[in-house]
A protein has these predicted regions:
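Active-site beta-loop-alpha junctions enriched in small/polar residues
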Residues: 1-4, 52-56, 84-90, 121-125, ...
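Short acidic/His/Gly/Ser-rich catalytic and metal-binding motifs that mark active-site loops
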Residues: 3-9, 158-162
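Active-site acidic/histidine proton-transfer and metal-coordination neighborhood
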Residues: 7-112, 214-224
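Histidine-acidic metal/acid-base catalytic patches
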Residues: 28, 32-35, 39-40, 66-70, ...
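Alpha-helix N-cap/loop-to-helix boundary motif
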Residues: 94-101, 124-132
Length: 228
């Protein structure tokens, strides 16, 4: 993501060959590290490697398909590629990521035999609603391409974690009142994900920088307990 911010043409979905080539080169470096780590440990050390349909505003489905075809040919040391869906580009609202739509990513993944990772917060940012992550989970599950779901919050108000609708990995609502990611939403999305074939659930949240270990664990348990 840092490279996307530095170079507006950087991305696996860039129609500009130079920009796409830079992203391919980075992906190859990641595959080499994953392979070397697995070789060193004597078993597959990495299970999934997430990739994204960058760049912002300029993402092209055909370019992304071509990139994924190339990446599938690499040796990932036992890991598999998953596409993490980020907020799609919508002209009427400022993007956080602004990549391809979920439908475009699903179509590509179904063709190539790949799967999609849903990030709760990034889907909420896209739809400006807590309903969007649930809808995305259902859509990916019904298409047979749902790899898993990570619970990362978002909200419509400025808070300690940033401006409104920031992709800021807000905690769940009990720990951050402005977060739309309530325990009820976590529960229904978890159920839908498992029913949709998800292989894993996870959490990705920010915490107060001075939070003691006990508080950090409790904030993660809030999410964990809601998935059960």
């Amino acid at each position: 993501m840092q490279n996307v911010g530095k170079n507006p043409l950087f991305g696996l979905a860039c129609a500009d060959e130079e920009g796409r080539g830079l992203a391919i080169a980075q992906a190859k470096q990641i595959s080499e590290v994953a392979r070397e780590l697995s070789d060193y440990l004597g078993h597959a050390a990495v299970s999934k490697v997430q990739v994204h349909s960058a760049p912002t505003r300029l993402a092209d489905a055909n370019a992304f398909r071509t990139s994924l075809e190339e990446l599938k040919e690499l040796d990932w040391g036992g890991a598999t590629i998953v596409v993490e869906h980020c907020d799609r580009f919508i002209k009427e609202q400022p993007p956080e990521k602004g990549f391809l739509s979920l439908k475009e990513e699903i179509d590509i993944c179904r063709t190539l035999g790949l799967e999609i990772h849903i990030n709760w917060g990034r889907s909420a940012v896209e739809g400006r609603s807590a309903a969007t992550p649930y809808e995305h989970i259902l859509e990916a599950g019904q298409a047979g391409v749902l790899a898993g779901v990570f619970f990362s919050g978002a909200g419509s108000q400025e808070c300690a974690y940033g401006y409104a609708w920031i992709d800021g990995h807000l905690p769940a609502q009990p720990d951050e009142p402005s977060s739309l990611m309530s325990e009820e939403e976590i529960a229904r999305c978890s159920k839908a994900a498992i029913q949709g074939g998800a292989k894993y659930l996870g959490a990705k949240i920010c915490v107060p920088k001075d939070a003691p270990l006990e508080q950090r664990i409790r904030m993660l348990k809030t999410i964990y307990n809601a998935t059960r």
